[in-house]
Amino acid sequence: MMRTEYCGAVTEALLEQTITITGWIHRRRDHGGVIFLDMRDRAGILQVVVDPDTPEAFVTADAARSEYVLKITGRVRKRYEGTENANMTSGNVELLAKEIVVLAKSETPPFPLNDENISVSEDLRLKYRYLDMRRPEMQERMVFRAKATSTIRRYLDDQGFLDVETPILTRATPEGARDYLVPSRTRPGNFFALPQSPQLFKQLLMVAGFDRYYQIAKCFRDEDLRADRQPEFTQVDIETSFLSEEDIMDINEGLIQNLFKTMLDVDLGKFPRMTYAEAMRDYASDKPDLRIPLKLIDVADLMQSVDFKVFAGPANDPKGRVAALRVPNGGSLTRKQIDEYTKYVGIYGARGLAYIKVNDASNINNGVDKESGLQSPIIKNMSDEVLVSLIERTGAQDGDIIFFGADKAKIVNDAMGALRVKIGLDMNMETCEWAPLWVVDFPMFEETDDGKWTSMHHPFTMPKGSVEELKNSPETALSIAYDMVLNGTEIGGGSLRINTVEMQRAVFDALGISEEEANEKFSFLLDALKFGAPPHGGLAFGLDRLIMLMVGASSIRDVIAFPKTKTADCPLTQAPAEVDSRQLRELGIRVREKAQAENKE
């Protein structure tokens, strides 16, 4: 073998032994005629000392530069007292070089690889991703991800799950996002679709009798990208038969508990449960961040008769919401800070951010002039009775501030839910480091802007109740679905699945999917349900997102080896790119040229 030890694995256990390492020069320093090389590999960094007593090695080291690839043989010795580095596994030892071989030279990298606070553009990092991943921070994240994936596999293997691969080339299905399409050469004019998830295939595996399935699956969605989205992403996909909703949740809760204990030595404890209705009422989000103790409080009933249309309008609108957010000690917020929060909620469609500062609540309760106890431009539009009720309901104390959201319920939820978290983080209100929970009892459907129904999760989710109940009241139907949330991020979602043709057709009907369309797109599933489909359900975790949270990265791009940009481009390979016209002809495809007007634009 070319080496006997990894750089980062050399410890005092190897003192006075002769070893061989290989790796890259992370840093090179000259001190008093002695050359110090910090040698790096994926296990870490080892300090190498090269002195003039070994002339050949010294000459080689003197000519070497950062990122040269070297093979070094030498003797492990203890560092001199006072030169130890407690931040490194190898920090108590160093290697006294006897022989150095240059395995590869390197040009000067386009950005420094030994700077922890790298300040280059993400596009440049992605263009030279193979260099970016040499940085210790990226190396640690990739190693962490690999070990986490192995931990997940071991847990599921021990639980009796089978790792089964499902097709990448499949057909388009309506799952809520655009498909990536792949033209067929053998059937011109027809297209495969890359899977948005293995959903239907894992259900068919249940019909086939493989009652415990899992897969670390690549999935593809052609959608607008954000910090936590990629066009291709990795999913821990799980499906089971003959288990209840509680059984499935317990297995997957155990998976995450085991993962955090193994990788971070963190005991997450039992996950609390919260219904969708409770989450939206108290936190204005179906993925609440429970580290933040702030809650929203509905006050629409108090605002129905106030002389303030901004509040009275939504308060009397069945689709409106008026919610208050009490921030303890928020009275210290400056006008500038409040203006910044007003701009922030505007991102989510809010047209403003009303507030009341509570200076002396007793003045209101005692009937003293309200303006001496409260500070806000809106209190002149409210009676003392309303203000007293408002203070009582929110539990506001002297020195607090109360923010208000009043609009269509969706706008209020989006804006105030985001504001709740932002204020909590800005004011360091987190009560713990990790806050997992289950959100359950989701609505089966949600209404679109044009008044139609769409699936809250996907059209194969089992509803609570009978077929007749679903047909009679689709608007109130709840699903047997469950999402796992961690620190305000949905890391996994699942449900029990429909296992009868009658219920599946009833759901298709509610979604406006005709029998003809259902037969065209899902005949294979409908046929399978006729042949004894067992009760089944499952869950899928977004692996990229989960790892991002665990390592404290700001984007999933930082935990994926070769990610795409926010515009779904790959700066490294320059993908997507034009292809040879011959290939297009073989596929029966002609690329339409842009109109002249478009070109001029």
Curated annotation (Swiss-Prot):
Q: What InterPro entries does this protein map onto?
A: Aa-tRNA-synt_II, aa-tRNA-synth_II, aa-tRNA-synth_II/BPL/LPL, Asp-tRNA-ligase_1, Asp-tRNA-ligase_1_N, Asp/Asn-tRNA-synth_IIb, AspRS_core, GAD-like_sf
GO terms classed as biological process: aspartyl-tRNA aminoacylation
Question: What Gene Ontology molecular-function terms does this entry list?
Answer: aspartate-tRNA ligase activity; aspartate-tRNA(Asn) ligase activity; ATP binding; nucleic acid binding
Q: Which reaction does it catalyse?
A: tRNA(Asx) + L-aspartate + ATP = L-aspartyl-tRNA(Asx) + AMP + diphosphate
Residues the entry annotates as binding L-aspartate: 175, 221, 457, 497
Pfam families per UniProt: GAD (PF02938), tRNA-synt_2 (PF00152), tRNA_anti-codon (PF01336)
Q: Tell me, in one coarse class, where this protein mainly resides.
A: cytoplasm
Q: List the disulfide bonds.
A: none
Location in the cell:
Cytoplasm
The record's Gene3D superfamilies line, in alphabetical order, gives: Bira Bifunctional Protein, Domain 2, GAD-like domain, Nucleic acid-binding proteins
**Binding residues annotated for ATP, in chain numbering:** 221-223, 230, 490, 542-545
Membrane-spanning intervals of the chain = none
**Residues flagged as site, Important for tRNA non-discrimination:** 31, 82
Q: Where is this region: Aspartate?
A: 199-202
Q: How does it assemble?
A: Homodimer.
Q: Which PANTHER family match?
A: ASPARTATE--TRNA LIGASE, MITOCHONDRIAL, ASPARTYL/LYSYL-TRNA SYNTHETASE
Name of the protein? Aspartate--tRNA(Asp/Asn) ligase
Q: Which gene encodes it?
A: aspS
